[in-house]
């Protein structure tokens, strides 16, 4: 009874307190979707996106109330990885951030708010920096893919999980 099939967007959004956008990665499509969502929701409803491809400031450009929009960046598999990055846009209200953080905590997640938008957000940037270095090491013949995976899995991965990077 937790899933309801609706015939229209208006019906689906009626009474919603939080709406999550997760459509194809296309900025113009997302900008249009945020404006369309806003036409059907209550003035207190929060609108979030899970993308790390675009800043909320751009996606909410056509919204009348961009103060209630932000990014929440979940990680796969979400039932195992507790972290969710919370990234406000330039016009996101602090009250919106606070409500979303409280909801995420209530859902058993570990929200980490970022202070400002940055391409790729925090975790993706760190992960990609490490990936670039590991691919370079493999390309230069320092170690094979299997050896690199073994070395990282049984050293840095454990240390990072236990102590954090800083």
Which positions does each model-derived feature cover?
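Helical "substrate-binding/catalytic lid" subdomain
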Residues: 117-166
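Helix N-cap / loop-to-helix initiation motif
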Residues: 1, 93, 143-147
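A non-catalytic, amphipathic alpha-helix used as a structural packing/dimerization or gating element
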Residues: 29, 95-106, 147-150, 154
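Electropositive phosphate-/nucleotide-binding environments in soluble metabolic enzymes
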Residues: 6, 27, 31, 53, ...
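Rossmann-like NAD(P)-binding element
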Residues: 1-47, 53-55
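Rossmann-fold dinucleotide-binding core
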Residues: 49-125
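Aromatic/hydrophobic pocket-lining residues that form π-stacking "cages" and hydrophobic walls in ligand
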Residues: 37, 100, 134
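N-terminal alpha-helical segment
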Residues: 30, 79-80, 130, 162
């Amino acid at each position: 009874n937790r899933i309801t099939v609706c015939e229209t967007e208006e019906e689906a959004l009626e009474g919603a307190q939080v709406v999550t956008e997760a459509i194809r990665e296309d900025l113009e499509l997302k900008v249009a979707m945020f404006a369309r969502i806003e036409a059907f929701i209550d003035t207190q409803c929060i609108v979030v996106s899970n993308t790390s491809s675009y800043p909320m400031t751009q996606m909410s450009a056509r919204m009348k109330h961009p103060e209630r929009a932000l990014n929440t960046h979940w990680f796969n598999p979400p039932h195992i990885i507790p972290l969710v990055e919370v990234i406000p846009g330039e016009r996101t209200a602090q009250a919106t951030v606070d409500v979303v953080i409280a909801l995420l905590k209530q859902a058993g997640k570990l929200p980490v708010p970022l202070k400002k938008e940055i391409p790729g957000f925090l975790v993706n940037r760190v992960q990609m920096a490490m990936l670039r270095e590991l691919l370079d090491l493999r390309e230069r013949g320092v170690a094979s893919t299997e050896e690199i995976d073994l070395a990282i899995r049984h050293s840095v991965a454990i240390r990072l999980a236990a102590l954090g990077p800083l």
